[in-house]
Amino acid sequence: MTSRMPLMAGNWKMNLNHLEAIAHVQKLAFALADKDYEACEVAVLPPYTDLRSVQTLVDGDKLKIKYGAQDVSAHDSGAYTGEISGSMLAKLKCTYVAVGHSERRQYHHETDEIVNAKVKASFRHGLIPILCVGEELEVREAGNHVTHTLTQVEGGLKDVPAEQAETIVIAYEPVWAIGTGKVCGADDAQEVCAAIRAKLAELYSQELADQVRIQYGGSVKSGNVAEIMAKPDIDGALVGGASLDADEFVKIARFRDQ
């Protein structure tokens, strides 16, 4: 039995304004019981404009839900219009920040070098990066999905020391399964997540590899989460659309009951 605490993180993407965010987090908090938090860490990744409202709610009501951002600047401050720095997120008491999400790589042309700089920026400010990796459909169909994903893992962790790497979360998200309704089979997801863990052992140590949490992301729902979570190298889920439905996200967090 793994000692890794499962992490269910809801990536809201560009959805929910700050008022909707408050109502949504309140609904999650009301539905989740102490036993749920003992079995699983629950986090939300709202848009930047919601973070202060979520922080105020979590602090004021002493909620056990964690929160974080969907991206971070590689820079700490300066003339970078539209960017948000790690120090700003740290001041909002964010725990997590997603880095290298496929939509950032695809629409904002983020390379492994940029993702690596953002991983380092996260660590500089005491944030835990959720490093997102995964392949497009043509890469999988060519049989290169493992190699492609491990290249992203290695690129994202370049020059990251072990004492930082041991706290990172890695999210395997096959791009072709995100928001499409297509689900990567649990065995296929396990294949890549096991390869990621083996790569961590190669880059650092087996001990470190056994510590790192590896999530699966890609059309996760309450109906498939139990099968995914039964796999030995999958330690949680990065949930997109389903996290916008509070009842559904609570069911996902209660994967052990599904």
Curated annotation (Swiss-Prot):
CDD domains: TIM. Its main location: cytoplasm. Coiled coil: none annotated. It is an enzyme of class 5 (isomerase). Pathway: Carbohydrate biosynthesis; gluconeogenesis; Carbohydrate degradation; glycolysis; D-glyceraldehyde 3-phosphate from glycerone phosphate: step 1/1. PROSITE patterns: TIM_1, TIM_2. Substrate binds at residues 11-13, 179, 219, 240-241. Keywords: Cytoplasm, Gluconeogenesis, Glycolysis, Isomerase. The active site is at residues 101, 173. This is Triosephosphate isomerase. It comes from Streptomyces avermitilis (strain ATCC 31267 / DSM 46492 / JCM 5070 / NBRC 14893 / NCIMB 12804 / NRRL 8165 / MA-4680).
